[in-house]
Amino acid sequence: HKPWGPFRGGKYSAFEAGTRVPFIVNWQGKTRAKESTALVSQIDMLATLARLVGVDISVKEVADSRDQLNAWLGHDEKGRDYIIGAASTLTVLTRHWKYIEPNNGGSYNPLTNTELGNDPRDQLYDMMDDRGEYDNVAGGNPLVVRFMKEILREEKAKGIGMEL
């Protein structure tokens, strides 16, 4: 039994089986039955639902959340440019690439029989050709790796964006 389908890893893993979640939007008269490849994140629910109910919230209040109502309704096939993921390390997911930041943590959890995605080397996967994340192509794509690292650097520099 493999509930995560073609994806590698599992719960608490940096691989897609640990982070990818199906998302279904059904709103009678507003949405049509179809599959979307728009890149959205659960963190976007706050900003999207706020817009939907007409509540104005500042970017400072919602930190990383972005309004994705057009993607939810099928009017925007793109969604976000990228999503930052966090397990035991950080990841950057675009429609084409997945980058996993180097990490010296354990690579495998024997209690859950799960690959965790931790590796001391950069990991880059071509999500168009390798959805299962089995072929690390970081060595052959140094410019993409550098670009993804820069996204992470910029996101980390932002901090959490709100006072606790």
Locations of the language-model features?
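C-terminal cap/loop subdomain of S1 sulfatases and analogous C-terminal strand-loop tails that border
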Residues: 1-16, 31-32, 38, 43-123, ...
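The feature captures the short pre-catalytic strand/loop hairpin that immediately precedes
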Residues: 23-32
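A generic structural signal for short coil/turn motifs at secondary-structure boundaries
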Residues: 32-35, 134-136
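Intrinsically disordered, low-complexity polar regions and short flexible loop motifs
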Residues: 130
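Active-site-proximal N-terminal segment of extracellular/periplasmic enzymes that hydrolyze or transfer
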Residues: 135-143
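Charge-dense polyanion-binding interfaces
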Residues: 147-164
